[in-house]
Amino acid sequence: MRICWYNDNRLGLVKGDRVYDVSKALEKLPKPTYPAARNGDPLIVHLAKLRPDIEAAATGSGTPIGDVKFLSPVAAPSKVIGTPTNYADHIAEADKQRDVFTMKRPSANIDDQGLFLKANSCLIGAGEVVKLRFPQRRTDHEMELGVIIGKPAEH
């Protein structure tokens, strides 16, 4: 089962080259509480229970996949963790620009680099545009891979 968030925060089920609006299945989610539970995105947490409702809601002709705007795949991540130089080419690039990088000595060792937190609102979907708030400042592009730690994943 391939699910997605698309257009105006609609939950979709992708089948072949079409996306089916299965947002009705979200009605089965438990009501939010305060303080909010800290166990992650409610859809992901309750996915096993919602799966039959998601599959049953995939009716009609769907929307061609090319006509939807995909949003971030996780609507409510609990946290996003990063590391400054996370692959060999970036470490080599940083080593050539020591005046720019605060450590002055890029290292492949994670203990030297440390980790940092990003806002959980920093995620975007495929094809979405990153808006630079201060375009006159130096901005380094980053391409990231998200990993869910803690549960076996399926596609």
Regions found by a protein language model. Name each.
Residues M1-Q113, Q136:
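N-terminal non-catalytic cap/leader segment that marks the start of a structured domain
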Residues F116:
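Metabolite-binding pocket within alpha/beta catalytic cores that recognizes anionic/polar moieties
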Residues A119-H155:
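Non-heme Fe(II) oxygenase catalytic core, chiefly the N-lobe of the double-stranded beta-helix
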